[in-house]
């Protein structure tokens, strides 16, 4: 069938298998061009199919020669219905890893569940023995608690005040003001339950108890801090409450791993177009401005540049780039005072008329479609493609 993009709000409901494969190949080519680094050899990535998690898997495998186990929740293509981008990304990753003799195994299921944790542990025990790095890169709208069965939904809201903030309606391509009511205490608690550090901690405890964490094993979870412009909706809002929970829980996890020479760190990455970030009301406008300013400065980076740099500069470097809270920082180019000042200066100047002139909304749209395998150079989008692409060595839970 011929697959075209169908966008609904902040999600594209179709994905292109060939486009996704080329995307993955370009990321592999990038990390190889940076040369190998002395990094992890057996890696578990929780949330491995898109965005930063996928980049973490690619960099570990193709620049450090790691065997990888990936956990994700994606949908395969069936009949004339395309699968999700994450499915096609993972199929491509497996294909390229296998071609180079790199071990790759994946688990498709709910990472919050005990069943998926157990299945993952069984695979590690059987095939790898242990892992020396666990990357936690999960973005999910809801979580069923594995012990109580309670379902929590996350919300994107400010805390303690109504927020009036400029935003960009990406469908209509107009600037509009978003009015967002503050979260209730229950909404805050639910968001922390979904996006905080409890599940990360549960994973590490389960892996540790099963004896599949190697001596000296490291773990990292990804976060975003941002600057003043994004603080009200992000760092000082419900998502921020969840991210602050990560900062608390990492201390306990670090203590647990340090006993055997290991370490646990929260890693701060830059703002990027991902399926997760496009859902945040003011993010498309912020990103469109940020892209414009950073590209002009020559400091713009995508997922793969960020994560590959995180491995080389911090996770596997004797002199990691770290802040006073002990977080690894890969977002310093975004937060450079001159970059932020220019974004802030342009923020109120953007109108419907000058949107394409003052911002890089064109680049934003292009990056958004690329997430789903569209608008990738060298791909024939009129060609017939089979939406059913198998993933070898996949366990369905």
Curated annotation (Swiss-Prot):
Coiled-coil region: none
Pfam family, one: Enoyl_reductase
Gene Ontology BP term (one): fatty acid biosynthetic process
List of residues binding substrate: 224
Site entry: Plays an important role in discriminating NADH against NADPH: 74
Example GO molecular function: trans-2-enoyl-CoA reductase (NADH) activity
Pathway annotation: Lipid metabolism; fatty acid biosynthesis
UniProt-annotated catalytic positions: 234 (proton donor)
Alphabetical list of InterPro entries matching this protein: Eno_Rdtase_FAD-bd_dom, Enoyl-CoA_Rdtase_cat_dom, FabV-like_NADH_b, Trans-2-enoyl-CoA_reductase
Keywords, in A-Z order: Fatty acid biosynthesis, Fatty acid metabolism, Lipid biosynthesis, Lipid metabolism, NAD, Oxidoreductase
Known catalytic reactions: a 2,3-saturated acyl-[ACP] + NAD(+) = a (2E)-enoyl-[ACP] + NADH + H(+)
Enzyme superclass (EC): oxidoreductase
UniProt binding sites for NAD(+): 47-52, 73-74, 110-111, 138-139, 243, 272-274
EC number: 1.3.1.9
Cited function: Involved in the final reduction of the elongation cycle of fatty acid synthesis (FAS II). Catalyzes the reduction of a carbon-carbon double bond in an enoyl moiety that is covalently linked to an acyl carrier protein (ACP).
Family: Belongs to the TER reductase family.
HAMAP family: FabV_reductase
Entry-linked NCBIfam families: EnoyACPredFabV, PRK13656.1
Subunit structure: Monomer.
Protein name per Swiss-Prot or TrEMBL: Enoyl-[acyl-carrier-protein] reductase [NADH]
Natural source organism: Methylobacillus flagellatus (strain ATCC 51484 / DSM 6875 / VKM B-1610 / KT)
Gene expressing this chain: fabV
């Amino acid at each position: 069938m011929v697959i075209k993009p169908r966008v609904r709000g902040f999600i594209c409901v179709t994905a292109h298998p060939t486009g996704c494969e080329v995307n993955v190949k370009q990321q592999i080519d990038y990390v190889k061009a940076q040369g190998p680094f002395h990094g992890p050899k057996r890696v578990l990535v929780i949330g491995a199919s898109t965005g930063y998690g996928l980049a973490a898997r690619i960099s570990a495998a193709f620049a450090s020669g790691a065997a990888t186990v990936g956990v994700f929740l994606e949908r395969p293509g069936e009949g004339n219905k395309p699968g999700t981008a994450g499915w096609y990304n993972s199929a491509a990753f497996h294909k390229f890893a296998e071609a180079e003799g790199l071990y790759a195994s994946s688990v498709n299921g709910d990472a919050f569940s005990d069943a998926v944790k157990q299945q993952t542990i069984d695979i590690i025990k059987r095939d790898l023995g242990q892992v020396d790095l666990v990357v936690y890169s999960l973005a999910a709208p809801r979580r069923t608690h594995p012990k109580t069965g309670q379902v929590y939904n996350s919300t994107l809201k400010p805390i303690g005040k109504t927020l009036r903030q400029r935003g960009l309606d990406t469908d209509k391509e107009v600037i509009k003001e978003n009015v967002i009511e503050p979260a209730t205490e229950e909404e805050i608690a639910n968001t922390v339950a979904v996006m905080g550090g409890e599940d990360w901690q549960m994973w590490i405890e389960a892996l540790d108890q099963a004896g599949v964490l190697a001596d000296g094993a490291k773990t990292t979870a990804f976060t975003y801090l941002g600057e003043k412009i994004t603080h009200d909706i992000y760092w000082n809002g419900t998502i921020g409450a969840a991210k602050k929970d990560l900062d608390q829980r990492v201390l306990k996890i670090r203590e647990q791993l340090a006993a055997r020479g290991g370490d646990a760190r929260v890693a701060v990455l830059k703002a990027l177009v991902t399926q997760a970030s496009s859902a945040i009301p003011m993010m498309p406008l912020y990103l469109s401005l940020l892209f414009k300013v950073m590209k002009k400065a020559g400091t713009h980076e995508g997922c793969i540049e960020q994560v590959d740099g995180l491995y080389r500069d911090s996770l596997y470097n004797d002199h990691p780039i770290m802040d006073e809270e002990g977080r690894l920082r890969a977002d310093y180019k975004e937060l450079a005072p001159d970059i932020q000042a220019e974004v802030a200066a342009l923020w109120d100047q953007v109108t419907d008329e000058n949107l394409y002139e003052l911002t890089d909304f064109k680049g934003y749209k292009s990056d958004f479609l690329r997430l789903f395998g569209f608008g990738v150079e060298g791909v024939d989008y009129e060609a017939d493609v089979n939406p059913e692409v198998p993933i070898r060595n996949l366990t369905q839970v």
